[in-house]
Amino acid sequence: MELLSALSLGELALSFSRVPLFPVFDLSYFIVSILYLKYEPGAVELSRHHPMASWLCAMLHCFGSYILADLLLGEPVIDYFSNNSSILLASAVWYLIFFCPLDLFYKCVCFLPVKLIFVAMKEVVRVRKIAVGIHHAHHHYHHGWFVMIATGWVKGSGVTLMSNLEQLLRGVWKPETNEILHMSFPTKASLYGAILFTLQQTRWLPVSKASLIFIFTMFMVSCKVFLTATHSHSSPFDVLEAYICPVLFGSASGGDHHHNNHGGSQGGSGPGSPHSPLPSKSKEELSEGSRKKKTKKAD
């Protein structure tokens, strides 16, 4: 009890927020990011036939969040590539995952208990990047709430918001896989986290930044580790969104029903024509019947 009272939550959170990310946590971030790249269809063949394109895709997976954040803030998009240590470390991870003999490195990091450790450490990096991105945006735009939220969001989402560009580098074009249309759990969590950190940065959330980093990191680590261990693609926010979204934005089925009724009312020729137009199937049957009559007359 004395130990628990001596080690308060504030001191623990402050110590946790001061833990350096390089090289251990950044290494885990690179491993998981490039591991997901190898899961993509055709990624292994691309690394054999076009290694430079594969390397560029790996760098996007590792540093795409920095590129997007610099683009939003009007800074050089290749600024982070001046960090030689991170580039060399990410390149070494890319080479080991794709070209290690007998896929030994890939098999080791894919082993589920080891992978869960890397996934947890990646979420530590994600939350820290959200907080740093919002602090950086606040330095340029003191009252730009939406700028801070957008910067923190892209910092946390990583390459997912650039998925279409990354697919083009692999020679794939799937516009239906746009992350904004179909948000995954990390993208949604990064958005909600960016809102929380923006409220804290602007003094609207009465909590210290270190405590918020610690609490949100524990939430992200718990959720992501559970989803990875159970091989689930669902989101913990689905239950909450199922209740809130119909209230705020209406249900999609109700809108479709109204649209169909509106189209059906315009389909008639007016109040004096209660019958709707014939469906396409009945028209085809009528045309087949007329053809049969013509053939009988010809016989």
Swiss-Prot record:
Activity regulation info: Channel activity is activated by a change of voltage within the sarcoplasmic reticulum lumen and blocked by luminal high Ca(2+) levels.
Family statement drawn from the similarity comment of this UniProt entry: Belongs to the TMEM38 family.
Binding site for Ca(2+): 74
Biased segments, Basic and acidic residues type: 281-290
InterPro entries: TRIC_channel
GO biological process: cellular response to caffeine; endoplasmic reticulum organization; regulation of cardiac muscle contraction by regulation of the release of sequestered calcium ion; regulation of release of sequestered calcium ion into cytosol; release of sequestered calcium ion into cytosol by sarcoplasmic reticulum
Residues on Cytoplasmic side: 40-52, 107-144, 200-209, 256-299
Lineage: superkingdom: Eukaryota
Cellular component, GO, one term: sarcoplasmic reticulum membrane
Residue intervals passing through the bilayer: 19-39, 53-73, 86-106, 145-165, 179-199, 210-230, 235-255
Function description: Intracellular monovalent cation channel required for maintenance of rapid intracellular calcium release. Acts as a potassium counter-ion channel that functions in synchronization with calcium release from intracellular stores. Opened by a change of voltage within the sarcoplasmic reticulum lumen.
Native species: Bos taurus
Record: residues binding a 1,2-diacyl-sn-glycero-3-phospho-(1D-myo-inositol-4,5-bisphosphate): 122, 126
UniProt entry keywords in alphabetical sequence: Calcium, Ion channel, Ion transport, Membrane, Metal-binding, Nucleus, Potassium, Potassium channel, Potassium transport, Sarcoplasmic reticulum, Transmembrane, Transmembrane helix, Transport
Transmembrane helix recorded as keyword: yes
Region (Disordered): 256-299
Lumenal side: 1-18, 74-85, 166-178, 231-234
A molecular-function term among this protein's GO annotations: potassium channel activity
Record field: catalytic activity: K(+)(in) = K(+)(out)
Entry protein name: Trimeric intracellular cation channel type A
UniProt membrane topology term: Multi-pass membrane protein
Compartments (UniProt record): Sarcoplasmic reticulum membrane; Nucleus membrane
Presence of keyword Calcium: yes
